[in-house]
């Protein structure tokens, strides 16, 4: 074979290899560093992170915050991040996993020191933006991250109101014209400020070959705050928070699917409370599909059922009484991690249990459109009622298939610490993560 033919073949193979690498789906693994401070079976260690890394393309460390006084990005847990050197411990794994990109996320609903510091940051002008950008770049570089994830804590949509079907049409009509849906009268101004911040931040990071991703948190109206066509070129990828559409904190009086793939019609449901709507919104704004990662949660949302909630469990479940009690591991009202949910499914160890440890009835969605749920009707005293909306390895796998079928960038998993990382349920560690990864291959 002539030298020119060898050269042509080599170039063709190089192009093909580059295409294959670029076309590999993302599996962006969010890591809530607070998991390392939990106790008992819920404590998540560096060793656990390392086991998960074999399945991830990116690891996102959560979370940093914003100083409300000077708008600099800062640690919100200095004892863990800096004094105990947890930031450095995590990024030290880059030496063993050079193919994985490590990002530091700011915001993510973890920055609770000040209620509206992110709006203040947007309104701070060029000087405030510059302080944030320079401090973010410095923090990312100091701890050897490959980039920054911007998970801005912006005003949320108002939760769905509980009312009968008879009045729902009029109420929706009235809200549309009275502006009852509006939670930020300056959203158009803030959208322009978000655009300017992202463009300037991207330019600063790119000077140091650093990545920039955007995470759209659940129930933040993308059309209010994100000028998608303008910001997409400045972002390496976008993680959509396509879960927690309904939660017991936002919707205490009725339980419903918290993370459906498609719209579940009827019963006063809102058409945008589903993965497909959110994803289509960004595509319609001319964002490349390969920049969009759909979000999947490794936990379920839990409501307390009352006697008035009935015993069918079929959503929408009325007369619920807010968040169900916290689980023994996650210790957060209205939320159970996957290991806790799995332990409540009927099994030999709970077949005779009563009260809060009694098994739940699992209802699987054969269509894979809305998600599974499980419930335990309240007893004769009105106690121990429980309703859970969740994704499991099967539905997580189905959503990963959705991402592949739509040629999306991939999946963002929220988060590693809520998966069954000890293998308590079936013996398989990280069952959610594994199921999603295998379907993305």
From Swiss-Prot:
Domain annotation GH18: ranges: 25-441
Signal peptide: 1-23
Localization annotation: Secreted
A Pfam family this chain is assigned to: Glyco_hydro_18
UniProtKB keywords: Developmental protein, Disulfide bond, Glycoprotein, Secreted, Signal
Cysteine-cysteine disulfides: 29-56, 342-425
Molecular functions per Gene Ontology: chitin binding; chitinase activity; imaginal disc growth factor receptor binding
Region (Disordered): 310-331
SUPFAM superfamilies: (Trans)glycosidases, Chitinase insertion domain
UniProt family annotation: Belongs to the glycosyl hydrolase 18 family. IDGF subfamily.
Cited function: Cooperates with insulin-like peptides to stimulate the proliferation, polarization and motility of imaginal disk cells. May act by stabilizing the binding of insulin-like peptides to its receptor through a simultaneous interaction with both molecules to form a multiprotein signaling complex.
Miscellaneous information on this protein: Lacks the typical Glu active site in position 153 that is replaced by a Gln residue, preventing the hydrolase activity. Its precise function remains unclear.
Record's protein name: Chitinase-like protein Idgf3
